[in-house]
Amino acid sequence: MFALRTAARPAARSVGATRNYATLREIEMRLKSIKNIEKITNTMKIVASTKLGKAQRAMATSKVYNEASEKVFENSETAVPENIEKRLWVVVSSDKGLCGSIHSQLARTVRRKLLDFESGEKLIDIVAVGEKIKAQLGRSNPEQMRLSFGGTGKEAPTFEEAAHIADEILALDTQYDDIEIVYNKVLSGISFEPIMKESYSAKAIEDAPKFGQYELEDDVVKNLADFSLANTIYAAMAEGHAAEISARRNAMDNASKNASDMINKYSILYNRTRQAVITNELVDIITGASSLE
């Protein structure tokens, strides 16, 4: 009977030891996975930090042209027409993710403003620049989507890209009384805000009080309106790109910090579990030695 009891104890201890070893392996695998994630997020943060300088320089360059254009319209007292029949919003985003809530916040702002502006059967048409905003607004407002453009966000935008988008918009069969650009404006290194910027139509320029003092040819007014649209889109794309890169850097920085915290917690848990395994093994050895005495 004594022999049966001593034989049963090692079997029970063996099950406990096996469970501890299995837990230890699980923790070790989880720890390895989190460390790999931390390496990836750290690398992405470094890449974003490197790209941010180029994006900020592109934003500064675009602002120089855009501010000069805005000054012309400000001095000429150009204003939005009072009776607007057709509106178009050009929503500027990009194709890339892993940058926090920057795309979803822009989409929420557009949806909210659409509810504020629309009345009756009149719908505001939308042009989506970037696959992210196209996907979000395409699900909620598919009937308002007129055009969409992909391939944005990989590099700092250029005026040629903005001019191509403007040409496609102007080639639409609808004559819009008002065109506004919706994009993310950089407030600081860690914050941004979706805003709307006006792009004046040829009619708005013709009706401006101080432009009316000059005899301008129709081609001049049209070219000025077309250039203004391309210029405004370019400025929005450049600033939106800088906001996105900054948001991605911050998101990857937060992810790296969270991964580091998890690594510390799992390291402590791993060491405690390992210590428990060693302690159990020592208990088994001592118990076995005592039973042989």
From Swiss-Prot:
It is a peripheral membrane protein. F-type ATP synthases have 2 components, the catalytic core F(1) and the membrane-embedded component F(0), linked together by a central stalk and a peripheral stalk. The central stalk, also called rotor shaft, is often seen as part of F(1). The peripheral stalk is seen as part of F(0). F(0) contains the membrane channel next to the rotor. F-type ATP synthases form dimers but each monomer functions independently in ATP generation. It is found in: Mitochondrion inner membrane. It comes from Yarrowia lipolytica (strain CLIB 122 / E 150). InterPro entries: ATP_synth_F1_ATPase_gsu (IPR035968), ATP_synth_F1_gsu (IPR000131), ATP_synth_F1_gsu_CS (IPR023632). PROSITE patterns: ATPASE_GAMMA. Gene3D superfamilies: 3.40.1380.10, ATP synthase, gamma subunit, helix hairpin domain. Residues 1-21 form a transit peptide. Keywords: ATP synthesis, CF(1), Hydrogen ion transport, Ion transport, Membrane, Mitochondrion, Mitochondrion inner membrane, Transit peptide, Transport. GO terms for biological process: proton motive force-driven ATP synthesis. Mitochondrial membrane ATP synthase (F(1)F(0) ATP synthase or Complex V) produces ATP from ADP in the presence of a proton gradient across the membrane which is generated by electron transport complexes of the respiratory chain. F-type ATP synthases consist of two structural domains, F(1) - containing the extramembraneous catalytic core, and F(0) - containing the membrane proton channel, linked together by a central stalk and a peripheral stalk. Belongs to the ATPase gamma chain family. GO terms for molecular function: proton-transporting ATP synthase activity, rotational mechanism; proton-transporting ATPase activity, rotational mechanism. This is ATP synthase subunit gamma, mitochondrial. The lineage of its organism: Eukaryota, Fungi, Dikarya, Ascomycota, Saccharomycotina.
